[in-house]
């Protein structure tokens, strides 16, 4: 089916900070690099972040939903069981907000979303047929989780590895272990940490656009 006969693929973005990857997606959708698609909403979990201004500038609705501010847990709670339960309840409530909306997404893109989802979010979203993808600044199976660039840099300096990279992948409960969508290796030429971080982040914008475009194409083809 031709694009003009199909409704746009509905994308929901989640971001926690500056939102440069979110901006790359906004620009790519506007330019048609991500074909026949529409960013329907932005979710943020931190107040007053630049991502909100980017959404407002593009006319994209946004919503703030936070673990503490929305009453799921008290600030400073240390009890591990209470924290785990609160995170699960928060995740389930966030999934419910998304799934009960009049306009539901077909794809969720985590663009600098600093929160690890539990089954409370992932199971209902998967059951609804919504794909969730993430960008991670490491190669598959290397440096999962937070601080990936710093850990890769330490390994590079120690001579344990000679390159690092970035990947876009599907999100599963195992952190950064979902099936890769696109992977790009990045050579290390002796740069210091700040230079390496800048080098990696400059490549992320292109990778998240290409990966989102690839998944959108698959969604549109499946529809047809």
Where are these regions (language model features)?
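One-carbon transfer enzymes
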Residues: 1-224
């Amino acid at each position: 089916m031709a694009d003009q006969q199909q409704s746009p693929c509905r994308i929901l973005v989640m971001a926690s900070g500056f939102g440069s990857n979110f901006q790359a997606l906004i620009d790519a959708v506007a330019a048609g690099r991500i074909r026949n698609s529409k960013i329907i909403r932005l979710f943020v979990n931190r107040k007053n972040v630049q991502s909100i201004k980017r959404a407002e500038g593009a006319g994209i609705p946004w919503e703030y939903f936070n673990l503490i501010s929305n009453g799921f847990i008290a600030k400073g709670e240390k009890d591990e069981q209470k924290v785990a339960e609160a995170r699960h309840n928060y995740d389930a409530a966030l999934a419910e907000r998304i799934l009960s909306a009049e306009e539901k997404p077909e794809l969720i893109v985590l663009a600098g979303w600093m929160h690890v989802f539990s089954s409370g979010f992932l199971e209902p979203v998967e059951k609804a047929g919504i794909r969730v993808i993430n960008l991670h600044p490491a190669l598959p199976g290397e440096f999962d989780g937070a601080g990936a660039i710093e850990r890769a840099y330490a390994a590079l300096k120690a001579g344990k590895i000679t390159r690092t990279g970035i990947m876009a992948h599907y999100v599963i409960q195992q952190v950064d272990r979902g099936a890769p969508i696109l992977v790009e290796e990045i050579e290390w030429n002796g740069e210091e940490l700040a230079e390496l971080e800048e080098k990696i982040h400059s490549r992320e914008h292109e990778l998240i656009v290409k990966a989102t475009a690839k998944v959108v194409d698959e969604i549109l083809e499946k529809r047809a």
